[in-house]
Amino acid sequence: MRKQVEIFTDGSCLGNPGPGGYGAVLRYKQHEKALSAGYRLTTNNRMELMAAIAALETLTTDCDIVLSTDSQYVRQGITSWIHNWKKRSWKTADKKPVKNVDLWKRLDTAIQRHSVRWEWVKGHAGHPENERCDELARAAASAPTLDDTGYQAE
C-alpha cells in the first residue's frame, strides 16, 4: 500500500522580481518535515512552483499525495494548462514560449511516480499549514543564499 502524504506549499517574493523563497511542509502519519530555501533574484510564481517541486522531489517512494497550494497558477498549470503546452511543444495558445518552462518540466517529472490530488486553499486566510509555509517562505526570502539559474528577466 502506498503512503498517504499531505503536502502544503507556499512561495514568496519581496519585489517580484526580487529576493524570493519557498516553504513546504510534508506530513506522513505523525511525521512532519519542513523545507525552505531562499533565492537572490526570482519571482513569486517560480517560488510557488519550487515549493511543490522541492516537496515532491524529497519523497523517495511512490505516494498518494494531497498537495495544498494557494497558487492558482500552480494548480491550474499542472492540472489543466500543461497538457496543451506539451502538445504544442511548450508554447502557449498564442504561440509564445511557456514562462518558467524549466520548472514546469521539473514539476511534470516529479509527479509521474505519484498519485497527486491538487487542492487550492485561500492564502492569508488562517489556514494553519499555509500560514506556516508562508512564514518559512518569507524567512527564506529575507535571507537568500541561492541563485535561481532558470530565472529570466523579461
UniProtKB/Swiss-Prot annotation:
Reactions accelerated catalytically: Endonucleolytic cleavage to 5'-phosphomonoester
Coiled-coil ranges (or none): none
Subcellular location: Cytoplasm
Ranges for domain RNase H type-1: 1-142
A Gene Ontology cellular-component term: cytoplasm
Pfam families: RNase_H
Residues noted as binding Mg(2+) 2 in the record, renumbered to the chain: D10, D134
Enzyme class: hydrolase
Cofactor note: Binds 1 Mg(2+) ion per subunit. May bind a second metal ion at a regulatory site, or after substrate binding.
Keyword entries, A-Z: Cytoplasm, Endonuclease, Hydrolase, Magnesium, Metal-binding, Nuclease
Superkingdom of the source species: Bacteria
Molecular function per GO: magnesium ion binding; nucleic acid binding; RNA-DNA hybrid ribonuclease activity
GO biological process, one term: DNA replication, removal of RNA primer
Binding of Mg(2+) 1, residues: D10, E48, D70
Matching Gene3D superfamilies: Ribonuclease H-like superfamily/Ribonuclease H
CC cofactor: Mg(2+)
EC number: 3.1.26.4
Job description of the protein: Endonuclease that specifically degrades the RNA of RNA-DNA hybrids.
Subunit structure: Monomer.
Similarity comment text for this entry: Belongs to the RNase H family.
UniProt protein name: Ribonuclease H
Organism: Pectobacterium atrosepticum (strain SCRI 1043 / ATCC BAA-672) (Erwinia carotovora subsp. atroseptica)
